[in-house]
Every structure is written in C-alpha cells, then in structure tokens.
Amino acid sequence: MANKSKLAKQKQREKTVEKYAAKRAELKAAGDYYGLTQLPRDASPTRLHNRCEFTGRPRGYVRFFGVSRIVLREMAHRGELPGVKKASW
C-alpha cells in the first residue's frame, strides 16, 4: 500500500490538472509559452502517474484493468476478471 501522503498528493495533482486544463489548451493553441510557464507545475498532465486502484502502487500498472500486476494476478486467480484465465501452452 502506498503512503497516504503520496496518494493525497496524486489526488491534488489530478484536481490541479483538471482545473487548468482549459487554460493550458488555450495558451498552447495561442503559442503563449511564457503564459504556460506562469501556471503551476502540477497543472501539467505529465506530472500525473498511473496508480493501482486498490493499493496505490505506481509500478507494474496494467492500464487496461487499472490495477497493478500483483492485484491483477490475485483477482484473476479469484475469478473476478471475466474472460481472464491462466495461460497454458
């Protein structure tokens, strides 16, 4: 489980990105790069990091399911992911 502080920081960044999304798009379309530098750093979507929905783990994230590889494996073994089964060849 990730630190609560890391998860809180991520949530705050998501809110900031959402808040400034329209303003950023407007400045980028106008080519006003100085204006972009005046926005908060966390307003940039590149500062966001995909995290597991259940554990908050930032590494080993499987985008299709929105969880880490570890949680994906556990859920697949429990049969909570329809259509997913253990590979055998």
Curated annotation (Swiss-Prot):
It comes from Deinococcus radiodurans (strain ATCC 13939 / DSM 20539 / JCM 16871 / CCUG 27074 / LMG 4051 / NBRC 15346 / NCIMB 9279 / VKM B-1422 / R1). Part of the 30S ribosomal subunit. Contacts proteins S3 and S10. Disulfide bonds: none annotated. GO terms for cellular component: cytoplasm; small ribosomal subunit. GO terms for biological process: translation. It comes from the Bacteria. This is Small ribosomal subunit protein uS14. Belongs to the universal ribosomal protein uS14 family. Keywords: Ribonucleoprotein, Ribosomal protein, RNA-binding, rRNA-binding. Binds 16S rRNA, required for the assembly of 30S particles and may also be responsible for determining the conformation of the 16S rRNA at the A site. It holds the Pfam family Ribosomal_S14. One of its GO terms (molecular function) is structural constituent of ribosome.
